[in-house]
């Protein structure tokens, strides 16, 4: 991480020439590249420098002298301060175009390839979509006030938010109620964060606390839970310390196209955008072109988000996941949904796997990969040994997707099609999906 030293005050007058993938304007000044927050291509701005190194500088736009025609008024009154969003000054269409251009650029630059066709970008609602988030909490003693929000941009401070426009409204519209609740606790200065998940069947909120809650504190939380129709979970240490304050709530999301209901725990990884997740899974199933003779392997399968819908059409599916708890819940969800042609195994896919039962002597003609941001270079190299000829790759990092694409091409695969999944509207985060075929 770069160390940020104190800078002499410097103000620029800049013409913004283009846009970076993370949502900053790009300008040039005295042979240096300047990355400018809150500035759009075509704008003339006054900007204050915030960072400097040999190759580039960073700045914040303080005055827009000539706004771009496509500049939008942000919906949120803390946009530009809060680090949660970076694209609220752009329309949904412009956001998609920027993300699509970035994906194309990364493919061309790193993998020296372009897909034979481009998929239409997947998108749904732009606001109130986010069903899982971690927000910071800070008690300000001088004001006797609790702040709840995402971290400020380029800062560890908590944004003072009364509402959040991207969070699902069942929580996003009630941050003040939560703040008022925490202000009444005896340990309000020892609560650094909460994590919330808004499922289709209930809401769970995990409250991290560094001191023990009193009986009175628990009563305050119980009253707040009743008011907001949520279930509080407390967390005094690691993940194994998470426990419900009262009766646990059953958390679910559905794949209605496949008659599947998924149950999960509040600490489990799930996609934050349920509606777009349904679209993404349907697209993946479509791209796999499944039939009753297919044997499919789903790598980094998690709860079985893709595995179980795939099993509705394939002969047999194997899901591989490194987290034992997720493997156990994937098995539970398969049984609960009466899906019998699937097996799940625990394996660390970043380590040697050739000796495992699901690998040794086994073949699969189709595969799905949905790795973390670090990508799947280790497992990609093994796909030919498994007999895979058709692969759907779901990515949350275009850079590692492009790196793995280069390896797949060397292994004889062709990049048939790819496109953007706008899982996180109003942010610069780029999810994508790609189809590879080995002839």
From Swiss-Prot:
Entry-linked CDD domains: AdoMet_MTases
Active site: 396 (nucleophile)
GO BP term, example: rRNA base methylation
Annotated EC: 2.1.1.190
Database matches in Gene3D superfamilies: 2.40.50.1070, Nucleic acid-binding proteins (2.40.50.140), Vaccinia Virus protein VP39 (3.40.50.150)
Recorded GO MF terms: 4 iron, 4 sulfur cluster binding; iron ion binding; RNA binding; rRNA (uridine-C5-)-methyltransferase activity
Binding site for S-adenosyl-L-methionine: 271, 300, 305, 321, 348, 370
Function: Catalyzes the formation of 5-methyl-uridine at position 1939 (m5U1939) in 23S rRNA.
Database matches in InterPro entries: 23S_rRNA_MeTrfase_RlmD, MeTrfase_TrmA_AS, MeTrfase_TrmA_CS, NA-bd_OB-fold, SAM-dependent_MTases_sf, TRAM_dom, U5_MeTrfase_fam
Pfam families: TRAM, tRNA_U5-meth_tr
Domain TRAM: 5-63
Signal peptide, first to last residue: none
Binding site for [4Fe-4S] cluster: 76, 82, 85, 164
Record keywords: 4Fe-4S, Iron, Iron-sulfur, Metal-binding, Methyltransferase, rRNA processing, S-adenosyl-L-methionine, Transferase
SUPFAM superfamilies per UniProt: Nucleic acid-binding proteins (SSF50249), S-adenosyl-L-methionine-dependent methyltransferases (SSF53335)
Catalyzed chemical reaction(s): uridine(1939) in 23S rRNA + S-adenosyl-L-methionine = 5-methyluridine(1939) in 23S rRNA + S-adenosyl-L-homocysteine + H(+)
Species whose genome carries this gene: Vesicomyosocius okutanii subsp. Calyptogena okutanii (strain HA)
Name of protein: 23S rRNA (uracil(1939)-C(5))-methyltransferase RlmD
Recorded family membership: Belongs to the class I-like SAM-binding methyltransferase superfamily. RNA M5U methyltransferase family. RlmD subfamily.
Gene: rlmD
């Amino acid at each position: 991480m770069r160390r940020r030293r104190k800078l002499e005050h410097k103000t620029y007058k800049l013409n913004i020439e283009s846009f970076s993938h993370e949502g900053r304007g790009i300008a040039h000044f005295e042979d240096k590249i300047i990355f400018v927050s809150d500035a759009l291509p075509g704008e003339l701005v006054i900007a204050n420098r915030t960072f400097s190194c040999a190759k580039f500088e960073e700045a914040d736009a303080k005055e827009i002298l000539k706004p771009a025609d496509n500049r939008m008024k942000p919906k949120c009154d803390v946009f530009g301060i809060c680090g949660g969003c970076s694209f609220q000054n752009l329309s949904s269409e412009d956001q998609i175009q920027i993300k699509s251009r970035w994906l194309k650029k990364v493919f061309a630059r790193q993998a020296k390839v372009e897909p034979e066709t481009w998929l239409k970008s997947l998108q749904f609602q732009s606001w109130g979509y986010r069903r899982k988030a971690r927000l910071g909490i800070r008690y300000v003693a001088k004001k006797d006030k609790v702040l709840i929000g995402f971290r400020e941009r380029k800062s560890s401070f908590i944004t003072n938010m009364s509402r959040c426009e991207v969070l699902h409204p069942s929580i996003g519209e009630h941050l003040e109620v939560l703040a008022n609740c925490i202000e009444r606790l005896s340990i309000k200065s020892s609560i650094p964060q909460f994590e919330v998940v808004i499922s289709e069947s209930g809401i769970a909120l995990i409250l991290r606390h560094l001191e023990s809650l009193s009986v009175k504190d628990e009563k305050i939380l119980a009253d707040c839970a009743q008011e907001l129709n949520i279930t509080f979970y407390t967390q005094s240490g690691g993940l194994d310390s998470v426990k419900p304050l009262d009766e646990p709530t059953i958390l679910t999301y559905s794949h209605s196209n496949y008659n599947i209901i998924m149950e999960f725990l509040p600490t489990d990884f799930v996609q934050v955008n349920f509606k777009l997740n349904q679209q993404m899974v349907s697209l993946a199933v479509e791209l796999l072109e499944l039939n009753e003779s297919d044997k499919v392997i789903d790598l980094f399968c998690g709860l079985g988000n893709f595995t179980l819908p795939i099993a509705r059409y394939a002969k047999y599916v194997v899901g591989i996941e490194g987290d034992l708890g997720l493997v156990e819940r994937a098995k539970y969800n398969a049984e609960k949904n009466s899906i019998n042609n699937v097996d799940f195994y625990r394996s660390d896919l970043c380590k040697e796997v050739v000796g495992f039962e699901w690998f040794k002597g086994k073949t699969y003609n189709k595969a799905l990969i949905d790795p973390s941001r670090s990508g799947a270079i280790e497992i990609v190299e093994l796909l030919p040994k498994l007999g895979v000829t058709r692969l759907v790759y779901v990515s949350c990092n275009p850079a590692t997707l492009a790196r793995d694409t280069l390896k797949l091409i060397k292994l004889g695969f062709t990049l048939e099609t790819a496109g953007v999944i706008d899982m996180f509207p109003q942010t610069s985060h780029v999810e994508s999906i790609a189809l590879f075929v080995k002839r």
